From Swiss-Prot:
Pfam family name, one: Ribosomal_L33
UniProt GO molecular function: structural constituent of ribosome
Organism: Staphylococcus epidermidis (strain ATCC 35984 / DSM 28319 / BCRC 17069 / CCUG 31568 / BM 3577 / RP62A)
Protein name: Large ribosomal subunit protein bL33C
Keywords: Ribonucleoprotein, Ribosomal protein
HAMAP family noted in UniProt: Ribosomal_bL33 (MF_00294)
InterPro entries, per the entry: Ribosomal_bL33, Ribosomal_bL33_CS, Ribosomal_bL33_sf, Ribosomal_zn-bd
Tree of life domain: Bacteria
Family: Belongs to the bacterial ribosomal protein bL33 family.
GO cellular component, one term: ribosome
Length: 47
């Protein structure tokens, strides 16, 4: 498993590092809490 960072869609802040299987072709998108936005927002996997 590889840890990948998740960026907030609204502010671009890197808030979370989550494990992901290597060899997975799709990018991860999760709805998580962003302390900078003070709300639950969509977080996308960054490179």
């Amino acid at each position: 498993m590889k840890k990948v960072p998740l960026n907030c869609e609204n502010c671009g802040n890197r808030n979370y590092n989550v494990p992901k299987k290597e060899g997975s072709a799709t990018r991860l998108t999760l709805k998580k809490y962003c302390p900078r936005c003070n709300a639950h927002t969509v977080h996308k996997e960054s490179k």
